[in-house]
């Protein structure tokens, strides 16, 4: 069942509209900085190092205060579709500072109807079917190429995006490999997948647990030890198969049926020890001690860390980038081909690229953003957090995902179904 939250505020006679929540994904994050890229299916460590070394920077704290918003559960509706003063946004859950939606409405009079999804696969299914009713979507680069090729997205009008000048040039170069000429998308946030763990619970079970390795989860002999305190995986087929192949020493972007079969074998071997496969619930479960180990996105694990600290129950949550390597992802803002309100979509995207807005967003969501001009405004704690900006020794471990062929996606979905069901 999906949960509905409605954020409203009065600014004259304007209201924000609805924020419909399915389930979170990569939760919250902060800044903008190092990135890497991989063409074809090999990664150049030197190229990654060059890209990661580009952002150095400035100081300043940008403590952005949030606006208190009341939440109310009620049935969702797309009642605003025919109106001109509305923008329909489809984004990952907990992937925006809610106060910014209110601010956008206050400044423009445009209501925000905000729906959420839990995986790229869900978004792509809707985009490929067409007539989504959405004006702004947030695909990852691994899916962007084929959405452009299929005609699911429309070109951006740069004349309506004056804040384009604030964008990080290195990230634009990365996106250019997926979107030649940067015609269809603008980076929103970027981050990594890794291991989130409850420090005390893990130590109690296994004092010498390999928290810096995917062995912690993929070695059945080790995973079995943590069955009782709980292991969670994000419900993200592409990301988990990428990670499984990294653990096995294979090309994580391989589309070989043989490699996928090896990944499936590794996953099925640990399936009896997995308590939760969910792109959202693992965050609170990690924060409250319901689980002790998770494969999650860095922002989600950091959000669990913050929630645990706020609760004051003694749970200390850590994030690790495994030594075998992991996924580096980039999420971008784009406009569906048949968006009902493209002018409002451009206004919303341009708003998000204002430096102070991008900084406030990163401070809340705990992910790095693609706005170079915002860097000095991001909180120091975010800018210096190695879970957000990995240090030099970790940068070579990050591998960007590439585009999946439709054939591989079908194979992967069948594999994932078997894994989730345990068959």
Q: Which residues are covered by each model-predicted region?
A:
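Early extracytoplasmic/lumenal segment of secretory-pathway proteins
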Residues: 60-63, 67-147
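Mature extracytoplasmic/periplasmic domains
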Residues: 336-397
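A bilobed periplasmic-binding-protein/Venus flytrap-type ligand-binding module shared by bacterial periplasmic
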Residues: 33, 196-201, 246-249, 329-341, ...
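Extracytoplasmic ligand-binding site segments that recognize negatively charged/polar headgroups
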Residues: 91, 96, 122, 133, ...
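Conserved C-terminal helix/tail region of periplasmic/extracytoplasmic solute-binding proteins
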Residues: 284, 392-423
């Amino acid at each position: 069942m999906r949960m509905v939250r409605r954020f409203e505020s009065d600014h004259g006679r304007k209201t924000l509209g609805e924020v419909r929540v399915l389930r979170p994904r990569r939760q919250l994050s902060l800044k903008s900085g190092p990135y890497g890229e991989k063409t074809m299916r090999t990664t150049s460590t030197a190229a990654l190092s060059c890209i990661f070394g580009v952002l150095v920077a400035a100081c300043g704290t940008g403590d952005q205060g949030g606006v208190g918003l009341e939440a109310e559960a009620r049935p969702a509706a797309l009642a605003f579709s025919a109106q001109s003063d509305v923008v329909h946004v489809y984004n990952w859950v907990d992937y925006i500072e809610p106060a910014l939606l209110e601010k956008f409405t206050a400044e423009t009079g445009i209501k925000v109807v905000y729906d959420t999804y839990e995986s790229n696969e869900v978004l792509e299914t809707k985009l490929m079917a067409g007539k989504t009713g959405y004006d702004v979507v947030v695909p990852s680069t691994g899916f962007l190429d084929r959405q452009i090729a299929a005609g699911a997205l429309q070109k951006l009008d740069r004349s309506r995006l004056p804040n384009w000048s604030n964008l990080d040039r290195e990230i634009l170069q990365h996106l250019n490999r997926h979107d030649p000429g940067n015609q269809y998308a603008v980076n929103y946030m970027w981050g990594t997948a890794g291991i989130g763990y409850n420090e005390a619970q893990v130590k109690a079970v296994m004092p010498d647990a390999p928290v810096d390795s995917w062995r912690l989860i993929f070695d059945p002999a080790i995973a079995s030890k943590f069955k009782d305190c709980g292991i969670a995986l994000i419900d993200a087929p592409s990301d988990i198969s990428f990670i499984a192949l990294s653990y096995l020493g294979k090309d994580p972007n391989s589309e070989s049926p043989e490699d996928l079969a090896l990944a499936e074998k590794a996953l099925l071997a640990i399936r009896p020890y997995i308590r939760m496969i969910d792109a959202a619930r693992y965050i609170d479960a990690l924060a409250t001690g319901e689980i002790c180990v998770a494969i999650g996105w860095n922002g989600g694990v950091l959000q669990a860390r913050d929630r645990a600290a706020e609760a004051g129950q003694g749970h200390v949550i850590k994030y690790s980038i495994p030594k075998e390597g992991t996924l580096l992802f980039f999420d971008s803002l784009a406009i569906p081909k048949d968006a009902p309100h493209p002018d409002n979509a451009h206004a919303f995207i341009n708003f998000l690229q204002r430096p102070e807005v991008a900084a406030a967003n990163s401070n809340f969501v705990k992910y790095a953003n693609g706005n170079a001009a915002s860097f000095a405004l991001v909180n120091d704690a975010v800018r210096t957090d190695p879970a957000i900006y990995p240090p030099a020794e970790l940068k070579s471990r990050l591998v960007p995902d590439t585009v999946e062929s439709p054939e591989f996606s079908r194979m992967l979905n069948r594999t994932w179904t078997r894994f989730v069901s345990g068959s």
